């Protein structure tokens, strides 16, 4: 019985801490525009179709890398 009460109190305490922390952190993100431009530049920085995409290349393909020829391919269009 004691253990059950201790577990219930611990769960309630942790839940309260989570709610207080989540409510307190709203609107405190710094450098929002810098973060979003970084994501966009990473998303558009890719290898075009027809170029080599083997394991030594640091960029990813805009489409997919053919497993046999190691050449970037565009996704097939329906």
UniProtKB/Swiss-Prot annotation:
Cellular component, GO annotation? extracellular region; host cell presynaptic membrane
Give residue ranges for the propeptide.
23-42
* Keyword match Methyltransferase: no
**Annotated tissue distribution:** Expressed by the venom duct.
Signal peptide: which range, if any?
1-22
Provide the transmembrane region boundaries. Answer: none
Q: Which Pfam families match?
A: Conotoxin
Q: Where in the cell is it found?
A: Secreted
4-hydroxyproline modification, residue list? 55, 67
Disulfide bonds listed in the record: 46-62, 53-65, 61-72
Q: Sorted alphabetically, which keywords does the UniProt record give? A: Calcium channel impairing toxin, Disulfide bond, Hydroxylation, Ion channel impairing toxin, Knottin, Neurotoxin, Presynaptic neurotoxin, Secreted, Signal, Toxin, Voltage-gated calcium channel impairing toxin
Q: Which GO terms describe its molecular function?
A: calcium channel regulator activity; ion channel inhibitor activity; toxin activity
Family in the record: Belongs to the conotoxin O1 superfamily.
Regarding domains, what does the record say?
A: The presence of a 'disulfide through disulfide knot' structurally defines this protein as a knottin. The cysteine framework is VI/VII (C-C-CC-C-C).
**What is this protein's function?**
Omega-conotoxins act at presynaptic membranes, they bind and block voltage-gated calcium channels (Cav).
Entry protein name: Omega-conotoxin-like Ac6.5
């Amino acid at each position: 019985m004691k253990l059950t009460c201790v577990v219930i109190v611990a769960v309630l305490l942790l839940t309260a801490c989570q709610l207080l922390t989540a409510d307190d952190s709203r609107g405190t993100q710094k450098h929002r525009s810098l973060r979003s431009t970084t994501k966009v530049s990473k998303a558009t920085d890719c290898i075009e179709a027809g170029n080599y995409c083997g394991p030594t290349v640091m960029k990813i393909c805009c489409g997919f890398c053919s497993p046999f020829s190691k050449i970037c391919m565009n996704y097939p269009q329906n």
